[in-house]
């Protein structure tokens, strides 16, 4: 079987019923940072403590504007001798132009890697399948491994899965090895798993709209409140210490006559009436017809609240439990 992407689209499946699946991640992009000042420069730009990031760890963090609003979130890790991050392709160009603004004063080269191949490996026996190709795999304790031109990331949520950053040759080997055993799917399957995991999806429609805490990045250990200065730090800190953040990321599931687009609002039932509320970050329809919506809503919303896609008289959406706690450390 020849390797080419994107893989043919299939209706996404929830993690509990997902067979072994290779997923082409064409909706995501890879960026690398190299040069002597790569760590120092990024330390002044993102919410995570880059000085504390080890070579066997990855972190989801935010890149903010001066008002603390996220240009994007980034899945950040070491790759080879440099740093790398993965973000949604829809906002790549704009986010990079912001990130590079002051790079001319530092010894750092920031560039997209359009030839890099991003493949997700998820579902039943994902670890066993990868072990046939790679002698060392990442784990929950050590979620990043490097082998030659390949970097492997491990994710525990919503169920064990892996993200492979590699080249075309290695991708071809993986496809050939697992053809006949694995399903193939496109980016929407990985998107569904991220929604189920409660990982915020920031696309171009929602860039520079939310502080990181409105999308639960603090609950995913993506914000350091003890590191030095970075762009937007004052607003991010104020949200924590002055209780300025009144929003949170939610996972909703139910039925809908259409899949809402990023940036749309939803409707919340109040007695006999419906009130517009919140912002959709991402949404997907599964193989069983269920619609999943990831949205930013008021953080005091009752767990039994009923919502729906805007103007959808026949649909209802219910709040689903996230696989992590939003309780703040005191």
From Swiss-Prot:
The keyword tRNA processing applies. It holds the Pfam family YgfZ_barrel. One of its GO terms (biological process) is iron-sulfur cluster assembly. One of its GO terms (molecular function) is folic acid binding. InterPro entries: GcvT/YgfZ_C, tRNA-modifying_YgfZ, YgfZ/GcvT, YgfZ/GcvT_CS, YgfZ_barrel. Keywords: Cytoplasm, Folate-binding, tRNA processing. Folate binds at residues 28, 190. It is found in: Cytoplasm. The keyword Cytoplasm applies. One of its GO terms (cellular component) is cytoplasm. Its main location: cytoplasm. Belongs to the tRNA-modifying YgfZ family. Folate-binding protein involved in regulating the level of ATP-DnaA and in the modification of some tRNAs. It is probably a key factor in regulatory networks that act via tRNA modification, such as initiation of chromosomal replication. This is tRNA-modifying protein YgfZ. It comes from Yersinia pestis.
């Amino acid at each position: 079987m020849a390797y080419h992407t994107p893989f043919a689209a299939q209706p996404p499946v929830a993690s509990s019923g997902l067979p072994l699946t290779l997923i082409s991640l064409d909706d995501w992009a890879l960026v690398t940072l190299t040069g002597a000042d790569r760590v120092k420069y990024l330390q002044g730009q993102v919410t995570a403590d880059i000085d504390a990031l080890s070579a066997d760890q990855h972190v989801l963090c935010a890149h903010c504007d001066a008002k603390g609003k996220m240009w994007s979130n980034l899945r950040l890790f070491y790759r080879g001798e440099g740093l790398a991050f993965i973000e949604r392709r829809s906002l790549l160009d704009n986010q990079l132009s912001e990130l590079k603004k002051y790079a001319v004063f530092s010894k750092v080269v920031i560039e997209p890697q359009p030839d890099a191949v991003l493949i997700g490996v998820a579902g039943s026996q994902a670890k066993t399948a990868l072990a046939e190709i790679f002698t060392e795999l990442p784990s929950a304790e050590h979620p990043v491994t490097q082998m030659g031109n390949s970097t492997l990331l491990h994710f525990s949520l919503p169920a064990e899965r892996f993200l492979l950053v590699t080249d075309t040759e290695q991708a071809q080997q993986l496809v050939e090895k697992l053809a006949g055993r694995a399903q193939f799917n496109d980016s929407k399957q990985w998107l569904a798993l991220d929604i189920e995991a409660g990982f915020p999806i920031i696309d171009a429609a929602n860039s520079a709209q939310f502080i990181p805490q409105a999308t639960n990045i603090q609950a995913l250990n993506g914000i350091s409140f003890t590191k030095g200065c970075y762009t937007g730090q004052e607003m991010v800190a104020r949200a924590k210490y002055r209780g300025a953040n009144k929003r949170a990321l939610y996972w909703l599931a139910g039925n809908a006559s259409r899949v809402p687009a990023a940036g749309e609002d939803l409707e919340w039932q109040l007695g006999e009436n419906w009130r517009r509320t919140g912002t959709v970050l991402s949404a997907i329809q599964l193989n069983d017809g269920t619609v999943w919506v990831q949205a930013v809503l008021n953080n005091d919303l009752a767990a039994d609240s009923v919502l729906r896609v805007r103007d959808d008289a026949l649909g209802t959406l219910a709040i689903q439990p996230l696989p992590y706690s939003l309780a703040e450390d005191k």
